Design a protein with these regions (language model features):
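Conserved C-terminal region and hinge/linker of Rieske [2Fe-2S] proteins, especially
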Residues: 1-177
Length: 177
């Protein structure tokens, strides 16, 4: 089968190879968008239960033979496109790819600043479309650091504030917890 496929594309000239590659990438992006839409629909309907699974994650692993990492990434991306339709539109239209959606989804799940991503999403989508992926990733990470300037310090302060200690005498010694 693969040999037949290779034989079919051998006749393409250099321009044809590039054109076909771009065509396939657009198809992949549309397919990724539809997959995320199906995951969202399946989640809201509880399709996994009718298929005998306890969770959407189990349903995805069983039906698609996905790894745990793939399942987690897809669920994050599905939540993002469900709550921010413009991301799904950009993906289905082929303006951005799965990597850009994944980076936005990761950022949207940041517990300290992810809820603010909607305020800058249009700008981030422009960057996702225009910049090479590594540059786009730096832009998103920079936005996170600016939106969460005190985040790490606040976590450290909360940890310190919430610390407790108790001392108990045990067998003539002191047990600190």
């Amino acid at each position: 089968m693969f040999a037949t496929l290779v034989d079919e594309i051998q006749s393409l000239d250099d321009h044809g190879v590039t054109a076909r590659l771009r065509e396939l990438e657009l198809e992949r992006r549309r397919g990724d968008a539809e997959t995320l839409a199906l995951i969202t629909l399946a989640t809201s309907r509880g399709v996994h239960r009718s298929d005998g699974h306890l969770s959407v994650a189990g349903w995805l692993r069983a039906n698609l033979n996905w790894s745990g990492a793939q399942v987690a990434a897809a669920k994050k991306a599905a939540r993002l496109v469900d709550s921010h339709e413009s991301v799904g539109d950009a993906l289905v239209d082929g303006h951005i790819g799965a990597s850009q959606v994944g980076e936005l989804a990761r950022s949207a799940r940041n517990p300290r600043c992810g809820s603010e991503i909607g305020e800058v999403l249009d700008l981030l989508l422009d960057h996702a479309e225009q910049l090479p992926y590594d540059d786009f990733r730096r832009v998103v990470r920079r936005w996170e650091s600016l939106a969460d300037e005190d985040g790490a310090a606040l976590d450290a302060d909360a940890s310190e504030t919430n610390r407790t200690v108790s001392a108990h005498e045990v067998d003539g010694g002191l047990d600190l917890r």
